A protein has these predicted regions:
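Conserved inter-motif catalytic segment of the P-loop NTP-binding fold
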Residues: 244-278, 285-286, 392, 432-440, ...
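Walker A/P-loop
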Residues: 218-259
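Walker B catalytic acidic pair
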Residues: 299, 305-306, 317
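Conserved alpha-helical scaffold flanking the Walker A/P-loop in AAA+ ATPase domains
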Residues: 207, 264, 269, 279-302, ...
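Basic, amphipathic alpha-helical bundle interface domains used for macromolecular binding and assembly
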Residues: 40-45, 60, 67-77, 289, ...
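Short loop/turn elements that form and flank the Walker-type P-loop nucleotide-binding site
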Residues: 59-62, 99-100, 130-132, 150, ...
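The Walker A (P-loop) glycine that initiates the GxxxxGKT/S ATP-binding motif of P-loop NTPases
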Residues: 220, 284, 306
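Peripheral, non-AAA+ core regions of ATP-driven protein-machinery
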Residues: 1-217, 221-224, 265, 468-469, ...
């Protein structure tokens, strides 16, 4: 007997349809699994055998061969247990092949026949829909993800027996109701910019960063509020669109980080890895590449606190994602490209002791130590950070004032308006904020005569690079958008230059 069943696995952050071919023939009892299965897939033989027996279904004591096509793709995860079991029952005439057409089965089997949760179900359902499947059967624990994709019927099953009885017509299951992804997009944050005392320049810089998707470095002594400000950056970003929310949810589903209570990621990611992180954990890696922190921060914020404490080689890996908005990882088994459009927010002290330039504490570092500390961050990486600002100590009068600062909601309103202007301008290019390339800078960041004179004077005075020139123009374009100005004026350019050059080597 021969049967073909549709299943799904993941490759990178995308789903891939797998054709599970099951052949049961005469011969000595054996169970061969071919088609480049990973260890978790090879172990499915024992899980499937026990699940069938404990669900009171016969397991064929003959020669069994299971092929997972395409054979050149490595099959990861345990989600192929269910289609293998369905294929064996089809060969045993428990299920009719005609009733399995255009149906996809995803799930890990426990030894007692229950169907366990698997990672990456959202990507698999999206791929199943793209491949023309009409129905998908997933574990009950993955129901939240199954509600998100429209245009395909998604069923949840708790046990193997429940699935078989449904396919036999003895017990009818109903497909999951579809969920409007953005219906509950009213995120209440536990932190707010209103809590921040003083630091008006930093607040302004973070507003510009949020409006234009610009990277920012904050330099200041310990306790001046760098981390506090960075953690509030995500609260002033615009709400995610449906496409952005699905993309982020897909990434978090793949790596198994999707919150239990949430069906979809509506809050923009905020990732803050420790400075001891390895390059593979930051960018992604493994024998079969998996997403790293730069991808987990996609459409959100990547906060690197104590920037010079990171390994220099690790920081240098940020060059490609900062420039291209994606990261390419090549391994012997596979080459993957992951999305990584994030706002880099970095913070550091001005020197090893932290008090260089402080108005109260005296710096105890030698000049050689300060120079060595600054050299930990390379010039090419610094050149890719749009805004670099100094933070001063918060005065006692600012700290004790009863006046609350401007709230995150008020700042977010201005950010959203600026983003709408950028969306209208860049919609044809598939961009949604001012993270433009060279050709877009030339087209959309033109200067009048007065602004051109300001740019030329500071370009020569500060020995700026061509990249610095373009990044200043992009920040100036965002400042103009926040001001509701169609053109970049000299005042917008002057502010952009100040925010770019206040931290000098």
């Amino acid at each position: 007997m021969f049967a073909q069943i549709l299943g799904e696995t993941t490759c990178g952050i995308d789903g891939v349809q797998i054709l599970v071919e099951v052949d049961v023939s005469n011969g000595l009892p054996s169970f061969d699994l071919v088609g480049l299965p990973a260890m978790a897939v090879r172990e499915s033989k024992e899980r499937v055998k026990a699940a069938l027996r404990n669900s009171n279904y016969p397991f064929p004591m003959t020669r069994i061969t299971v092929n997972l096509a395409p054979a050149d793709l490595r099959k990861e995860g345990s989600g192929l247990d269910l289609p293998i079991a369905v294929g064996l029952m089809t060969c045993g005439r428990i299920l009719e092949p005609e009733k399995l057409e255009n149906k996809v089965f995803i799930g890990e089997l426990s030894l007692d026949g229950r169907i366990r949760k698997v990672s990456g179900v959202l990507s698999m359902i999206m791929d199943a829909k793209k491949c023309g499947a009409q129905e998908v059967y997933i574990p009950q624990a993955n129901a939240a993800e199954g509600k998100l994709i429209h245009g395909i019927d998604v069923y949840t099953v708790a046990t193997l027996k429940e699935l078989v009885e449904h396919l036999q017509g003895k017990n009818t299951l109903t497909p999951l109701p579809k969920e409007n992804i953005l219906q509950n997009n009213n995120k209440i944050y536990h932190v707010d910019f209103a809590d921040v005392k003083g630091q008006l320049v930093a607040r302004r810089a973070l507003e510009i960063a949020a409006a234009g998707g610009h990277s920012i470095l904050m330099v200041g002594s310990p306790g001046c509020g760098k981390t506090m400000l960075a953690r509030r950056l995500v609260t002033i970003l615009p709400p995610m669109t449906e496409a952005e929310a699905l993309e982020v949810t897909k990434i978090y589903s793949i790596v198994g980080l999707l919150p239990q209570a949430d069906s979809v990621m509506l809050e923009r990611p905020f990732r803050s890895p420790h400075h001891s992180i390895s390059g593979s954990a930051l960018l992604g890696g493994g024998s079969t590449p998996r997403p790293g922190e730069v991808t987990l921060a996609h459409n959100g914020v990547l906060f690197l606190d104590e920037l010079p404490e990171f390994e220099r080689a690790t920081l240098e890996m940020l060059r490609q994602p900062l420039e291209d908005g994606e990261v390419s990882i090549s391994r012997v088994r596979a080459a993957m490209t992951f999305p990584s459009k994030f706002i880099l927010c970095a913070a550091q002290n001005p020197c090893p002791c932290g008090f260089l330039g402080d108005s109260v504490h005296r710096c105890s570092c030698k000049q050689a130590e300060i120079d060595s500390y600054k050299r930990k961050i390379s010039g090419p990486l610094m050149d890719r950070i749009d805004m670099q600002i100094n933070l001063s100590r918060v005065e006692f009068s600012e700290l004790k004032t009863k006046e609350k600062g401007e709230s995150s909601a008020a700042i977010r309103e201005r950010v959203v308006k600026a983003r709408l202007l950028q969306q209208e301008r860049l919609e044809a290019l598939g961009m949604h904020c001012n993270a433009m390339g060279r050709s877009e800078v030339v087209k959309y960041c033109q200067l009048d005569a007065a602004a051109q004179n300001v740019m030329e004077r500071y370009f020569n005075m500060l020995n700026l690079s061509a990249r610095s020139h373009d990044r200043i123009l992009k920040v100036a374009r965002t400042i103009a958008d926040l001001a509701g100005s169609e053109n970049i004026e000299a005042v917008h350019l002057a502010e952009a230059i100040q925010l770019r050059t206040s931290v000098r080597p």
